[in-house]
């Protein structure tokens, strides 16, 4: 066995800077289990290498590959690590080095022979792909099943594919879904065990879940850690069984879901062939799984009869033979189709026609799916697929009227695209090559998209091209899933490196891919102008935020360009296809906004760790960013105070922060330590004592109910303890960040901070005693008026603050350095401070603390990500891409997809049709239609045109936020405007010139129809 010598992470350690986004998908326990797993992949055509790529990126102990067959030109259709120079060499040997580059922690080996099946004992998971015969798969599976080795099989043929999973007689699933354990506050527990949620909060539980309780008063025995099985009664209540013998419920209580491991049993491949268990990939094709189950078996039988050759492309003789084989199998395996179900000859014929094809989108779909099943097999995380799944995308085939498929048009032409030509035909391949496309973003989805496009040959023709843009640069945390990038690329521009990488994959793209580093938005409309958008065939988003997606979507609607949209969140992924005049747009439906945390909860009444983390991040922002920026503005902007006094925000807080920052400037690092220690006392001791002074622990509401009940947890002040890890790190990180603000050298070697050095400074400090403020009011509910709202300008307190500020002229040249929050730098103290600060506040309120990783996830608003989902989702997008190139107009041919690989779940639906409107008996598309006006028309002529040609009386006309015309304008204003061309009118009203790059303008109108009724109508596009 040959191998590479790669660096291994130490046992029990995970490189969080590399795996950070994946850790939030799998968790540390699963990652550590993966690091003890050796994986073998048999077959390194497109499917095998896609699986291997995703598994190596994920980080297993080792990867071994086996494929001694020589590289052929047609392999380049889907095997992205092969080049024409590799033709004739062994696929395994050539691919190993490329796989090894993906992850320095995963050694990649080549298995030299498969003659002795017992050598498989060294592996925990074996994956057999489409180069392995069914007979050999059965033999290998029998050995694996009896030896406790997890076995997975998969193969793709044209637009068809399947996978099979056998994880043995007894496999333990540790976490079926991967979702965060649900938790909630209880308002009541009845004797029969009915648990009711507090404040109409949904519990989110399902029948059969298990929960444990804490902080229940009255039913104290519930708090002993016992697990209770849940029976759901509704969204706000569930039952746990009788609790009569436990006593009587008084108040309080928190439930927490507990994931209980469960065992699953799998059957062998031999058993499953005749009596399969299916996971359905598309419920609209419910009946196809059984047909394809027989069809794929028949393909293997055909190959045995024909010296390993699969049916010839579009050959009816071979197709009829395959149908006969399937018919015979249906008799031998009657359980598969079931009684009275005939063989679907059209489906089997299509399988025969495409058997020699290899399509990047299908390969990417199964490559992501199977790789995730490998990770499940290694870790026990998520629910395995049980046991067969079949998939097809026959809707992707082009219209035979436009692109006829026959033996002649699908024959190989000695091209790297031959396996794609076998499915779609040569003419369609030419149309793919001559497409003009725009990819927005080259991160995880963008890299996968470009890889697939390189394999497709998209944009490689004489009339085709690809434009990709991304204004981001490569970071180490990207390398775990953005596979076109290597460690040497860190710091470089994503789009440029990605473009260079795919040109190396497919030299046909050289000179055909234009990499830009410009953000797509209103500020770059001079770059991405009218002529740019109008030249495109379609657009693909590879973005990670809603605002950018929405902007691109609006551009595509305006220019009537198809848009392929997709996104991932951990193991979840979605795809959406947007077609002009056919479907709704991305912006037509929006996710509900995130539920914000009430300010009163943050300020005074937190009850879970999310609240304390949000509070700590806000404190970080105030201490180290806002204060420094306010000081700098005060010192450089002469009218800063005057402008601040006019604002409705926290004027007093702004002025206090400036005063404190300038009057208490530290002179050395010891001063920074003292500042941090005093802030600890203020935030975690004095402020809590003040809160309890206002609302003692025995306080009652106006209704006579205990004030500290329900979601309000009575806090306790903290006494500083330098040997408490959170207390100490609040001071360490706080002092270091304050030193950064003031340009003071901190005690910031990367070594562990010395407790004794900090202690010697703190021991000599005088910590002020707490004195309650009887005049301080604390807001209890967000709906209540803020009792400490800003005093009016000119009040004594504000005047004193203003007069206390030093004259900026006495501080000429002085400047503070604001801290710019960066979550992924473990040496900058940012997450260290927020973690310590949040945990100290959690200790105040008896909330379970969180480690650095969880704090970073919440404070940094990190999106969990893993290469497997990205690969699968991109595959689905590329199957829709063929339909765009074919200009399909039947909405039923398109598919929007939602997947969750953790369950696993696959859902496909037709896109929602665009909404239609009507005026004066004229129907129009509310999204895609508009009134097109050519030339810089006069306002009066525009009004007349609508009256004569559309039967509409324009009552208002606007450009952006500027009102150009209204029927109620005074006669003088109307006279002034009616004779102006639109461009001059816009200039007059906005007092701005029309930019030179603008050749189209959008005008919004309000209009009355012939009956004088106000009607909704499309916008106007003026083509200059």
UniProtKB/Swiss-Prot annotation:
Modified residues (N-acetylserine): 2
Main location: cytoplasm
SUPFAM superfamilies hit by this protein: Activating enzymes of the ubiquitin-like proteins (SSF69572)
A molecular function (GO) term: ubiquitin activating enzyme activity
Domain of life, source organism: Eukaryota
Annotated positions binding Mg(2+) 2: 544
Keyword Transcription regulation part of the UniProt annotation: no
Keywords, ordered alphabetically: Acetylation, ATP-binding, Cytoplasm, Isopeptide bond, Ligase, Magnesium, Metal-binding, Nucleotide-binding, Nucleus, Phosphoprotein, Repeat, Ubl conjugation, Ubl conjugation pathway
Position of the signal peptide: none
Regions annotated as coiled coil: none
Sequence repeat intervals: 27-164, 425-579
Binding, Mg(2+) 1: 472, 475
Enzyme class: ligase
Effect the entry attributes to changing residue 1004 to K: Strongly reduces formation of the thioester intermediate with ubiquitin
Binding site for ATP: 21, 444, 470, 478, 481-482, 494, 520, 545
Listed pathway(s): Protein modification; protein ubiquitination
PTMs per UniProt: The N-terminus is blocked.
Gene Ontology BP, a term: DNA damage response
Membership in a protein family: Belongs to the ubiquitin-activating E1 family.
Subunit comment: Monomer. Binds two ubiquitin chains simultaneously. Component of the RSP5-UBA1-UBC5 ubiquitin ligase complex composed of E3 RSP5, E1 UBA1 and E2 UBC5. Interacts with the E2 ubiquitin-conjugating enzyme UBC4.
Entry function: E1 ubiquitin-activating enzyme that catalyzes the first step in ubiquitin conjugation to mark cellular proteins for degradation through the ubiquitin-proteasome system. Activates ubiquitin by first adenylating its C-terminal glycine residue with ATP, and thereafter linking this residue to the side chain of a cysteine residue in E1, yielding a ubiquitin-E1 thioester and free AMP. The RSP5-UBA1-UBC5 ubiquitin ligase complex ubiquitinates RPO21 forming 'Lys-63'-linked polyubiquitin chains.
Protein name in the entry: Ubiquitin-activating enzyme E1 1
Source organism per UniProt: Saccharomyces cerevisiae (strain ATCC 204508 / S288c)
Gene behind the chain: UBA1
């Amino acid at each position: 066995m040959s191998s590479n010598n790669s660096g291994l992470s130490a046992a029990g350690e995970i490189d969080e800077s590399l795996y950070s986004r994946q850790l939030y998908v799998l968790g540390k326990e699963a990652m550590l289990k993966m690091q003890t797993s050796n994986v073998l992949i048999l077959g390194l055509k497109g499917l095998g290498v896609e699986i291997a790529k995703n598994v190596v990126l994920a980080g297993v102990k080792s990867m071994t590959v086996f494929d001694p067959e020589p590289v052929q030109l047609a392999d380049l259709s889907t095997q992205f690590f092969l080049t024409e120079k590799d033709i004739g060499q062994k696929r395994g040997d050539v691919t190993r080095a490329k796989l090894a580059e993906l992850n320095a922690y995963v050694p990649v080996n080549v298995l030299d022979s498969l003659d002795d099946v017992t050598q498989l004992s060294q592996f925990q998971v074996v994956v057999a792909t489409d180069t392995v015969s069914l007979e050999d798969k059965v033999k290998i599976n029998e050995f694996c099943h009896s030896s406790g080795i997890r076995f997975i099989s998969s193969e793709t043929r044209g637009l068809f594919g399947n996978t099979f999973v056998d994880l043995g007689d007894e496999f333990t699933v540790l976490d079926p879904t991967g979702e965060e354990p649900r938790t909630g506050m209880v308002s009541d527990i009845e004797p029969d065990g009915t648990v009711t949620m507090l404040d109409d909060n949904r519990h989110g539980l399902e029948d059969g879940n298990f929960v444990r309780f804490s902080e229940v008063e009255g039913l104290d025995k519930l708090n002993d850690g016992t697990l209770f099985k849940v029976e759901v009664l509704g969204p706000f209540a569930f039952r746990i069984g009788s609790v009569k013998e436990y006593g009587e419920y008084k108040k309080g209580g928190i439930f927490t879901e507990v994931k209980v491991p469960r065992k699953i049993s799998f059957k062998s491949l031999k058993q499953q062939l005749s009596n399969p268990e299916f996971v359905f990939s598309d419920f609209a094709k419910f009946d196809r799984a059984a047909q394809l189950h027989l069809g794929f078996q028949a393909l293997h039988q055909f190959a045995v009869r024909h010296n390993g050759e699969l049916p010839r492309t579009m050959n009816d003789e071979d197709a009829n033979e395959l149908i006969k084989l399937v018919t015979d199998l249906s008799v031998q395996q009657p359980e598969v189709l079931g009684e009275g179900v005939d063989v679907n000859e059209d489906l089997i014929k299509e399988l025969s026609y495409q058997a020699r094809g290899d399509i990047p989108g299908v390969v990417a779909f199964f490559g992501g799916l199977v790789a995730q099943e490998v990770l499940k097999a290694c870790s026990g995380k998520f629910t395995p697929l049980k046991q067969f799944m079949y998939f097809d995308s026959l809707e992707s085939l082009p219209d035979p009227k436009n692109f006829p498929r026959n033996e002649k048009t699908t024959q190989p032409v000695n091209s790297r695209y031959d396996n794609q030509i076998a499915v779609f035909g040569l003419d369609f391949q030419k149309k793919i090559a001559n497409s003009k496309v725009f990819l927005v973003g080259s991160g995880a989805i963008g890299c996968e998209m470009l890889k697939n496009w390189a394999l497709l040959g998209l944009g490689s023709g004489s009339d085709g091209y690809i434009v990709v843009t991304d204004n981001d640069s490569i970071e180490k945390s990207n390398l775990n899933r953005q596979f076109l990038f290597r460690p040497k690329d860190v710091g470089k521009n994503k789009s440029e490196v990605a473009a260079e990488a795919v040109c190396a994959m497919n030299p046909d793209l050289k000179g055909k891919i234009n990499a830009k580093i410009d953000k797509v938005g209103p500020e770059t409309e001079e770059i991405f102008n009218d002529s740019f958008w109008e030249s495109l065939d379609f657009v693909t988003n590879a973005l990670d935020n809603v605002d950018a997606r929405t902007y691109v979507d609006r551009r595509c609607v305006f220019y009537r360009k198809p848009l392929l949209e997709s996104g991932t969140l951990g193991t979840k992924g979605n795809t959406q296809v947007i077609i002009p005049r056919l479907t709704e747009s991305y912006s037509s439906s929006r996710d509900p906004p995130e539920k914000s945390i009430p300010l009163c909860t943050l300020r005074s009444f937190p009850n879970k760790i999310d609240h304390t983390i949000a509070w700590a991040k806000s404190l970080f922002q105030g201490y180290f960013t806002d204060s420094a920026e306010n000081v700098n503005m005060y010192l450089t902007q002469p009218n800063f105070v005057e402008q601040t006094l006019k604002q409705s925000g926290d004027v007093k807080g702004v002025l206090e922060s400036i005063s404190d920052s300038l009057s208490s400037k530290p002179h050395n690092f010891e001063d920074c330590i003292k500042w941090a220690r005093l802030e600890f006392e203020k935030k975690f001791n004095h402020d809590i004592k003040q809160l309890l002074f206002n609302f003692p622990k025995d306080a009652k509401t106006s209704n006579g109910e205990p004030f500290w009940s329900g979601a309000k947890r009575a806090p306790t002040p903290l006494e500083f303890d330098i040997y408490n890890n959170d207390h100490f790190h609040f001071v360490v990180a706080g002092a270091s960040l304050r030193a950064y603000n003031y340009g003071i050298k901190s005690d910031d070697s990367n070594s562990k901070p010395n407790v004794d050095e900090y202690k010697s400074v703190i021991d000599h400090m005088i910590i002020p005693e707490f004195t309650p403020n009887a005049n301080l009011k604390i807001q209890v509910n967000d709906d209540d008026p803020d009792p400490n709202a800003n005093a009016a300008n000119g009040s004594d307190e504000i005047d004193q603050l203003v007069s206390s500020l030093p004259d900026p002229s006495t501080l000429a040249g002085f400047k503070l350095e604001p801290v710019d929050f960066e979550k992924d730098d473990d040496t900058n103290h940012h997450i260290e401070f927020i973690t310590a600060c949040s945990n100290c506040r959690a200790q105040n309120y008896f909330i379970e603390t969180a480690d650095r990783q969880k704090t970073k996830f919440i404070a940094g608003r990190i999106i969990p990500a893993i290469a497997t989902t990205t690969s699968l989702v991109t595959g689905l997008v590329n199957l829709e891409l063929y339909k765009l190139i074919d200009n399909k107009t039947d909405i039923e041919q398109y598919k929007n997809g939602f997947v969750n690989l953790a369950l696993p779940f696959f859902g496909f639906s037709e896109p929602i049709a665009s909404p239609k409107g009507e005026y004066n008996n004229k129907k129009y598309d509310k999204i895609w239609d508009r009134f097109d006006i050519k030339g810089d028309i006069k306002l009066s002529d525009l009004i007349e045109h609508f009256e004569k040609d559309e039967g509409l009386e324009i009552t208002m006309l606007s450009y952006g936020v500027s009102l150009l015309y209204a029927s109620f304008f005074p006669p003088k204003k109307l006279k002034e405007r009616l004779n102006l061309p639109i461009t001059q009118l816009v200039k007059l009203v906005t007092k701005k010139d029309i930019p030179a790059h603008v050749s189209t303008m959008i005008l919004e109108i309000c209009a009355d129809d012939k009956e004088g009724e106000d009607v909704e109508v499309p916008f106007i596009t003026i083509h200059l």
